[in-house]
Amino acid sequence: MSDGEEDTTAIVCDNGSGLVKSGFAGDDAPRAVFPSIVGRPRHQGVMVGMGQKDSYVGDEAQSKRGILTLKYPIEHGIITNWDDMEKIWHHTFYNELRVAPEEHPTLLTEAPLNPKANREKMTQIMFETFNVPAMYVAIQAVLSLYASGRTTGIVLDAGDGVSHNVPIYEGYALPHAIARLDLAGRDLTDYLMKILTERGYSFVTTAEREIVRDIKEKLCYVALDFEQEMATAASSTSLEKSYELPDGQVITIGNERFRCPETLFQPSFIGMESAGIHETTYNSIMKCDIDIRKDLYANNVLSGGTTMYPGIADRMQKEITALAPSTMKIKIIAPPERKYSVWIGGSILASLSTFQQMWISKQEYDEAGPSIVHRKCF
């Protein structure tokens, strides 16, 4: 992309509960990926002239986590702390992408079934604080389907804060059949913290939680047959792996490796009364018209960081096959880049010529106010 073009290119910003993915429309991967964290010092600054800040965002907060209290402004996909969120957006535009937001149309993403007020406030901040010329809010799962090159399918988008099943037919999301599950990566991290405590390793602070998240991402996997895997783990050490903590101490984990993500299939592990992701997928398909179910079964698209566990696609295939009619053809699509497929879908959408009339312009916002977002963005 030449510099001449970059002056009006749309910005795509996928604000996840765990990671912000941002970059320019038309690129094939996000330029900036950093944790959605704002950190504030826990202690009084004593060294004068150190240039200490009262808050840190993203990677800088992550690297100084030992002296900070870390907060995530987005919980379960819903922005709960708007001041911190503004800091994150400011950091995205000015420090990561190094652009002036008033020159770029901006595409944001959100989870389906989010409160309406959440969208309006996002719209308001974009136009009033950052003065963007135009903006749009897209549903995350729909973008993932775009990225996989399909217009029909059922997406299981599981991130850090929220998971959802969205059936889409010929490009239309079917709102009555959307299933939302407030069980995602962060809950799995918390559960892993808990079961590691049973092994005698204690992780408590917000900084230590980040270590556990790293253990989860590096060592966890989904068992094809949970009971059988538990038996294997009990009778041999073949499933044990070691992990070195930042202070050099080495810990060993065994059945925790697959007990942690098993929660996705058995939410009762963390005391949730909900159905597992395989059942929510099936229920969501069953709420759709009988004529389109076949197409949905054949196009199960996984997206989001919490679908990155090895073995998850095979397990989904097995579980959904068990629930579906016996002759049904079932296909699970798990693209290797699914961690970023929401962003990639946004990049595709924002660079389509047909999309250009879909933007909410500053002028429309000034005339109608924040509620315009419900009229223009499905």
Curated annotation (Swiss-Prot):
Where does this chain mainly localize? cytoplasm
Keyword Ion transport recorded: no
Q: Which reaction does it catalyse?
A: ATP + H2O = ADP + phosphate + H(+)
Listed SUPFAM superfamilies: Actin-like ATPase domain
The compartments listed are:
Cytoplasm, Cytoskeleton
Q: Which domain of life is it from?
A: Eukaryota
Chloroplast as a keyword of this entry, yes or no, is no
Q: Which GO terms describe its cellular component?
A: cytoplasm; cytoskeleton
Report keywords, A-Z: ATP-binding, Cytoplasm, Cytoskeleton, Hydrolase, Muscle protein, Nucleotide-binding
One GO MF term attached to the UniProt entry? ATP binding
EC code: 3.6.4.-
Which SMART domains does the record match to this protein? ACTIN
User: Which InterPro entries does the record cross-reference, listed alphabetically?
Assistant: Actin, Actin/actin-like_CS, Actin_CS, ATPase_NBD
Question: Cross-referenced PANTHER family, in alphabetical order?
Answer: ACTIN
What does the UniProt function comment say about this protein? Actins are highly conserved proteins that are involved in various types of cell motility and are ubiquitously expressed in all eukaryotic cells.
Protein family (similarity comment): Belongs to the actin family.
Protein name, please?
A: Actin, muscle 2/4/4A
The organism encoding this protein is Halocynthia roretzi
